[in-house]
């Protein structure tokens, strides 16, 4: 493929934008460097770069594009918003309709509040949990990304009962000491940390199904232990469903798992491709939010008509019978094809899949937590990524990220992808 125009775009971007990208995950640093491909158009399961190359898209904008690019029903809603006003700074009927749709889909949310991103949603659930409990510490799990605000950019200490350390320049030690980080799917480490700090913890923040070091499901009984211990210690449970909500079925991962968190943070999919965040939970907890209570949260763009109408339209599309089953079916075909190709070419991988999302790890270790995900060979993944890109298959440029199917992928797309995987693996072996 010719990428001359993409290279020129990146060279110009480096003159004006920090690192040439507006999010570090878009850089190709983790796959050996080079100029990121600059896209110009998307439709359905595909997008096209500035050089005219077409790609089957499994990035899906890191998850939000579950209905594919440019879905006509969502595009119509966005056009209506553009023609009738995208921002009023007042209440609208759209936010009421959308909030009710979210409540019906995720029954743990008695009340909802909108904001502008998953980061904002998680950040505010922590503030609300602190206000409600009167405590300050939070617990999170290693490798789970919850946004870029200070409190969640904290690495684990030297053991499960130790305080966290800053995971980014600019995060203070005092902030890090408010965070306890433990391994996902490790009941012993979790229990030890809760025995040490449980009475000081305001909330346990967790992805019910991990999406940020690949697709990793909780082991049987692990989330149940988290809930039971939180209740015993008087801490709240916060589910970060920014990736998982409406990705695997119509509703939250919590519905699939049969569990009820105290608070839930949403984003990505629910915006229909526009910026959005939302959070919700039990009425008595949510009533601590201003103007009813002392926990302040506001936003000029929160609940804007464009995002609300796009979100409503997206959820209407996702109510179509059978679409999640079809993504699961296609995901199964893709999984079988990848595993068969790996066996044929002697490439060592572990593959985790849940319905229409999967991750390939270049390791022989079963991946159930972040430490095991780190075993995936980044150098091999970088080569694989570029081999796939040159065949017109676009993946996230990181060994930790998931492949996301959309409602617009077809079996022909899957077979074309498997053919590309076969060639890529043949070059790696």
Curated annotation (Swiss-Prot):
The keyword Isomerase applies. Its cofactor is pyridoxal 5'-phosphate. It comes from Lysinibacillus sphaericus (strain C3-41). The keyword Cytoplasm applies. PANTHER family: GLUTAMATE-1-SEMIALDEHYDE 2,1-AMINOMUTASE (PTHR43713), GLUTAMATE-1-SEMIALDEHYDE 2,1-AMINOMUTASE 2 (PTHR43713:SF1). The modification N6-(pyridoxal phosphate)lysine is found at residue 268. Homodimer. It comes from the Bacteria. One of its GO terms (cellular component) is cytoplasm. Its EC number is 5.4.3.8. Keywords: Cytoplasm, Isomerase, Porphyrin biosynthesis, Pyridoxal phosphate. It is found in: Cytoplasm. One of its GO terms (molecular function) is transaminase activity. This is Glutamate-1-semialdehyde 2,1-aminomutase 1. One of its GO terms (biological process) is protoporphyrinogen IX biosynthetic process.
